[in-house]
């Protein structure tokens, strides 16, 4: 199981195929996504990579956080996240994961925070049908109707769908296809929409419900901290070696 990456949503555009068909894509940018720390079975009880992305001023950071980045010899990061991996998929601390960590044509799962919509009614928030337009209904056309029973149970149950704050939820979209990658600019173009607003932080990982392509690099494509490029062999070549 390979590591994912932390990216920022740039926006949406479209790309054209050789046949002239256009594909709507979301542009995701890797902002110097580096490995900050390892989580091991011996020390933590599980295996994972802690990644960091984006620049952050140290003046706004607690001393403890600054110490963690200093130990890893990594510049302070604005966003930090963990990705569970297998033991053979650990990437050295300080290495920068590149955009071609994902190959064109493979499917990925993306996770982000949905755009906030503020206070919304039942029809917008939960797709309720509303009440009738006439025949005894006045003023309350967009209300949700009854919310509970009679004297028994005498209450409204928890998790009842009602008006309230809409958006700002953690959303995962499955099986988005990678259309293009740009290593020099650190861009990943995925087909379709990605949850969140422009500039929002997105987690991208290999699709859980789709097979990993044979040419996907393991443990990944990354640049070492000393400036050297680590070219990981595709999984098919590693198995045949």
UniProtKB/Swiss-Prot annotation:
InterPro entries, per database record: Ribosomal_uL3, Ribosomal_uL3_bac/org-type, Ribosomal_uL3_CS, Transl_B-barrel_sf
Residues annotated with N5-methylglutamine modification: 151
Renumbered residue ranges of the record's region Disordered: 139-164, 215-241
Pfam family for this entry, one: Ribosomal_L3
Key words, A-Z: Methylation, Ribonucleoprotein, Ribosomal protein, RNA-binding, rRNA-binding
Residues in coiled coil: none
Gene Ontology biological process terms, A to Z: translation
Molecular function terms from GO: rRNA binding; structural constituent of ribosome
GO cellular component: cytosolic large ribosomal subunit
Post-translational modification as stated in the protein's UniProt record: Methylated by PrmB.
PROSITE patterns: RIBOSOMAL_L3
Top-level taxon: Bacteria
Assembly and oligomerization: Part of the 50S ribosomal subunit. Forms a cluster with proteins L14 and L19.
Cited function: One of the primary rRNA binding proteins, it binds directly near the 3'-end of the 23S rRNA, where it nucleates assembly of the 50S subunit.
Database matches in NCBIfam families: L3_bact (TIGR03625)
Family the UniProt entry places it in: Belongs to the universal ribosomal protein uL3 family.
Protein name as catalogued: Large ribosomal subunit protein uL3
